[in-house]
Amino acid sequence: MRASLLSRIVPAVVSLVVALAALPANGANDPDWVDEVPSKSQTQVETKEGKTVLKLGIEHSSRLAPIPDFLQAGSIFDSKLLEGGNDKLIWYRIPNWLAGQWQRTRETRVFSHDYASGYVDNSQSTFMSEQIADFGVQKDREGNIWNCNLKPKAVSDHGSYFSVALMQAKEPVRSTNKEIIFREVYTVLDVQKESKLITDSYLMESLTRHRPLPDGNLETNMSFEVYNAGGTPRSVQENVSQDQRKGPPDLIDNYKGRNLKAEFAEFLRNNNLGNLVP
């Protein structure tokens, strides 16, 4: 992939994936982010045995499982993949300082690397990224806030074609009173509108670290690694932002016909946490 192509594709994929992560669980606009001024504490990047390593103690995967044949380029896209939601919700606790509504207006790219060409770009580039995100779906008896993934897919319109991001996984890999780091994996498809032909498919793994700032805002560092359909890394990009708190968490008891309060209580009981049922 040429550097010029990398500069077009990576931001587009990042915007789609960030939009998916940002979708608010219950909002009409579907949410996630904002930034004011890029953080001065830039993401530090190095490589180790061919892997991109954030100086967070977290590494990107050296490989991912290949995309199934029916989702690879040349196949016809099945629109049924866009119907319905997650059959099984994955619940995880988040720090109380993360719970709430956050707004982002822009991000700054601080690093990108195309593995095939060897092209590396350490220049900073700020771009608009207007998003609002909700963190927090349910609260347990002790006041702890829990989240789950209600939005497993997102679609972005590009005129003659659209891109689809299908979430495979999202989970916190580290959570303390000072930071939380999420790992997310997506399958991304480019689909021609008229023919429904899949013209490209690839994978993306994102590592996102949130840290509370003294002024009440949120410092966010993001690393997005793109993999080809076979699961081999082809490029990586690092972004930073500051997200502004816009309000408290908007907890959700019901969503698209699902009783989330009951499902959360069942999750707690099934995991020997019945004492936390609200």
Regions found by a protein language model. Give the residues of each.
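N-terminal glycine/threonine-rich, aromatic-flanked beta-hairpin/loop signature
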Residues: 114-168
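Intrinsic-disorder/low-complexity loop/linker signature
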Residues: 49-50, 143, 178, 231
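N-terminal chloroplast transit peptides
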Residues: 1-3, 21-28
